[in-house]
């Protein structure tokens, strides 16, 4: 299910103060958050950037090893994007493009990355109170991924998200 929310993604708070919010974004395989929402996440959740970058370095920044995958990294309570009284947020990095892919390839990598993310969150849910909606399904908060720097029409990514049994809160301004 996709729910569109007009507002600031970074202002999202889960309904329960014991739940961990997950913010997802599409990112490159180069280990650099240099533009778009990634650059904002780097400022608001600085503790997550070395984890993302290290993950890319571990894979040799090789698109063939990263595209279509995801990595979920925890932030620290001291990060300026976290709010007192709520658990630190998790940042989900979806490896959807290396800037050399067609729109169709990016969409296919997005499908694989979302599938990997869902699997990772279900596993994480065994030990961490990941935010869930009223339906009991995992909630993932995100902007219109791929629609910015990667220039994929939103409708193509939206069709991928609709396939998954997850609640996606898509923030629009």
Swiss-Prot record:
SMART domains: A1pp (SM00506). InterPro entries: ADP-ribose_metab_enzymes, Macro_dom, Macro_dom-like. Pfam families: Macro. Its EC number is 3.1.3.84. The keyword DNA-binding does not apply. Belongs to the POA1 family. This is ADP-ribose 1''-phosphate phosphatase. It comes from Scheffersomyces stipitis (strain ATCC 58785 / CBS 6054 / NBRC 10063 / NRRL Y-11545).
